[in-house]
Amino acid sequence: MQAKVLPLKTIRNPRDLGGYLTQDGHKVKMQRLLRTGRICNLSRHDQQYLINYGLRKVIDLRSEKERKQDPDTLISGTKHFNISISPEDNTEAGTSFEDLFKKFDANPTAAFEHMRENYRLMITRPHSQRAFHRVLEEMANTPEGAIIFHCSEGKDRTGLTTFFILYILGVDLETIRQDYLFSNYMLNDYRARRDLEAKEKGSSLAFRANLRLLGSVADEYLDNAIITMCEEYGGIDSYIKKQLAVSDELIDLLRKLYLE
């Protein structure tokens, strides 16, 4: 099944996770779990669409620095929760071209290894593990209405959050992977704009290659997270139960709330 893209013009990568089938024959409910990029500077149209769509909660996965730089638009009738997946110093989102240039101007594949390492860190850091747990708990505390969970581009921190909730709901790994990779299609225009800006600034081809890698998802990034869970924590199920402290009761509640 193809991803359900929301008709929002001022939000990057907006999708409803509803409609995905689970391995035991259930379906993820529509208008419940929405994954997006940042939601600053929303148009009135997009705000009203989300209100009409039943939005009740917004979970901001970004760092405090990012939130201050590009604060969420406060949407009428919704509650906002700040749950940072990454510490302040572990995301390139919101970083200036000048600072990125210092890091990624020479080696055209530096960003690839940087992203793989970021995914490993999101799995191994206690900070991130606690944050994923809090997000899942907040989902379990939402008996009705829609939740937006978002980072900056809606692909990495949001991508792993989506991985965990869909896996817990019983969606198969290949479907989860295809949903994750769909961010590349959704962010094509965004990457093109960034590349043009870098070109106009006279940036090197190596830097522009790295910029595209930073604005993309890849099988290898997600695989590094999965491999880390399997090799260091005994598997995905073990990781979710032990490192994310997700109980059988929490799993049952999430499935009750988000499946039909």
PLM-predicted stretches and their roles:
Residues 153, 157-158:
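Ser/Thr-glycine-rich phosphate-binding loops at phosphate-binding pockets of nucleotides
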Residues 1-148, 161-260:
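Cys-dependent protein tyrosine phosphatase-like superfamily
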